[in-house]
Regions:
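Divalent metal-dependent hydrolysis catalytic cores, especially in the metallo-beta-lactamase
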Residues: 53-59, 71-100, 117-129, 158-170, ...
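Conserved phosphate-binding/catalytic loop of the ribokinase/pfkB sugar-kinase fold
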Residues: 129-156
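Histidine-rich, glycine-flanked metal-binding segment
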Residues: 1-45, 388-390, 394-396
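Acidic, glycine-enriched loop/beta-strand segments at the rims
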Residues: 10-17, 325-333, 342-377
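Active-site core of metal-dependent hydrolases
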Residues: 152, 156-279
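Short acidic/histidine-rich active-site segments
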Residues: 263-285, 292-311, 355
Length: 398
């Protein structure tokens, strides 16, 4: 596909004309300022989310998973500017995970939207901590030590699509498993862990490259030092993924993660099926009875202080960082596009520049929210959704 897209470059603020040809950006030309351009929207790379469990009532972890569910979720995400994502499967039994992985692979084979948007599967479990707190909502009966043979069976069911696996380094089997994953080109992320600092360092030495929703999936009370959060913050080798929805992490911790990780900071939605749904009472297969408030907070019905998942999609999380002064617009967008692309080894890491894939978003920033999001994938303009990032009107913070 070929064409021209105009807007303000998200890094410079200058008006530009982006030329698209053959699915890539062939040129980015800066234009002279003119009064008619004063209200031009912003142009930025398409967003990449490496942890998505569902949205708009579509759940990747309600089984049996169908390819149609994956395809529908892929279309919804593309419409809202998420041009690539990792469908995330959480802890379950071996046959259940194999079935879900197979359904995702089938969707990628059969459906254009899924084939374009799915970058690989994120397997979040079952190789996690069995301890309350770090385990989070993952079912304890399915938690198990890292098992390479089991992983290979899931990878076969996934037709090779598993790209990321979250592992707790507290298991004795973890270093060897991490080394095998690294050799196979699979990214290992540290998460849902009660590991000692020594075990964290050993995991990094074996090849772990990322932290899953850093600061969440922890004990309620940690030692001042040492502890597994500080150790991951201090590991320069690790990309730090964070949920910036105004609910999961306080601004002070988000600021610390952003300052320590810098060009290895990544925004993730960790969105569940209720993302984009109206406020009300719901029932989830994990968590049971839950309440979604008008502010986008999802909590257990009987325990308002306990979160039951994230409901804010990636565009809104980037806007939250800008609105609260935690990041500039260009920084927030890089956390949600360039940085995850670099982690995954994708050409999209070049950003909005000549030679990069023609995956773009164009939007307006109004009252601290991204509005009127338009999306191009492989140089083709896609239909867009309801105009904001997640289908809701939640504005948190600021």
């Amino acid at each position: 596909m070929s064409g021209l897209v105009t807007g303000r470059h998200y890094k410079t603020g200058r008006p530009v004309e982006v030329s698209l040809a053959g699915g890539v950006i062939s040129a980015v030309t800066e234009l002279p300022e003119h009064p008619s351009m004063a209200e031009w929207p912003w142009l930025a790379p398409g967003l990449i989310d490496v942890q998505v469990n569902g949205g708009w009532g579509l759940d990747l972890n309600t089984l049996p998973l169908t390819p149609d569910t994956v395809s529908a979720l892929s279309r919804r995400l593309l419409e809202r500017g998420v041009t690539g994502y990792c469908p995330t499967l959480i802890t379950n039994g071996e046959p259940q995970l194999a079935q879900a992985a197979s359904a995702i692979a089938a969707a990628v084979r059969r459906d254009a939207a899924a084939g374009a948007a799915v970058l690989g599967i994120h397997l979040e479990g079952p190789f996690l901590s069995p301890e309350d707190g770090p385990r989070g909502a993952h079912p304890k009966e399915h938690i198990r030590p890292p098992d390479w043979d089991a992983f290979l069976r899931w990878q076969e069911a996934a037709e090779g699509l598993i790209r990321i696996v979250t592992v707790s380094p507290e298991w004795p089997e973890a270093p060897d498993f991490i080394s095998r994953c690294r050799a196979a080109g699979v990214i290992v992320s540290i998460g849902h862990t009660a590991a000692t600092p020594e075990q964290i360092r050993e995991a990094v030495a074996a090849g772990a490259a990322m932290s899953t929703h850093l600061g969440n999936g922890t004990h309620l009370i940690l030692p001042r030092h040492p502890n597994y959060v500080w150790e991951q913050l201090a590991a320069d080798e690790l990309y730090g993924c964070m949920i910036a929805d105004g609910q999961h992490l306080p601004p002070s911790l988000l600021k610390v993660i952003l300052r320590t990780k810098q060009n290895r900071a990544i925004l993730v939605s960790d969105a569940v099926s209720l993302s984009g749904m109206p406020a009300g009472a719901y029932r989830l297969h994990i968590g049971g009875e839950v309440v979604l408030t008008g502010e986008g907070r999802l909590h257990l019905a009987g325990s308002p202080g306990l979160l039951a998942g994230s409901t804010m999609m990636l565009p809104d999380q980037a806007a939250y960082l800008v609105r609260t002064g935690l990041a500039r617009l260009d920084e927030a967008l890089d956390y949600a596009s360039v940085h995850p692309a670099r982690l995954l080894g994708l050409d999209q890491a070049a950003g909005l520049a000549a030679g990069a894939p023609a995956d773009l978003i164009r939007f307006r920033l109004n009252a601290g929210a991204f509005e009127g999001i338009e999306c191009w994938k492989h140089g083709r303009k896609l239909p867009h959704g309801s105009g904001n990032g997640n289908g809701n009107s939640h504005v948190v913070g600021g």
